[in-house]
Amino acid sequence: MMGEDPKRWLMDHAPKKGIDALAPAISISAAARITGLSDSALRKYESAGLIIFHRTAGNVRMLCVEDLERIELIQCLIKKRGLNLEGILRLWALLPCWEFKRCRPESRERCPAMHDSERPCWVLLSGEKGCEGQLCRTCEVYRFGAYCTEDLKVLLRSLPGATKAED
């Protein structure tokens, strides 16, 4: 059960605690070999907004352990749940990032994610510094929100002000 604090729930469900899961260490070609996908499929995930790769100073894509786990999750959503890339984006767009981050009301009104149900916040803020000065790829909503796909209804019911389901 998630409990009362959705942000804490997301952090508790973070993948592989105890290692630096954000350290870019894997080239896109190595990631393709590990995942069994092609380089072009991984680039397609990036261009669709499903994943934010690290970029070196020379603009070379690099992945971290968390990126590999995210790719595995995307593959699971495609193969086991029958979603396509657009379906995954729309599902992730339902995550109320403003609740997880406890955004101030004035920030919420300016936030494009508050008014768009088709793209997750990190896609809407692409090319920007993210929200509240935090880079999207380091934000807990981007990093861990995707993992709550199975528990989305429970997650949404646990948010402050949400209507509780009747037993």
Where are these regions (language model features)?
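Arg/Lys-rich, alpha-helical DNA-contact motif
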Residues: 2-28, 33-34, 52-58, 65-167
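Functionally constrained cores in energy, signaling, and assembly domains
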Residues: 31, 35-39, 44, 63
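Major-groove DNA-recognition helix of helix-turn-helix-type DNA-binding domains
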Residues: 39-58
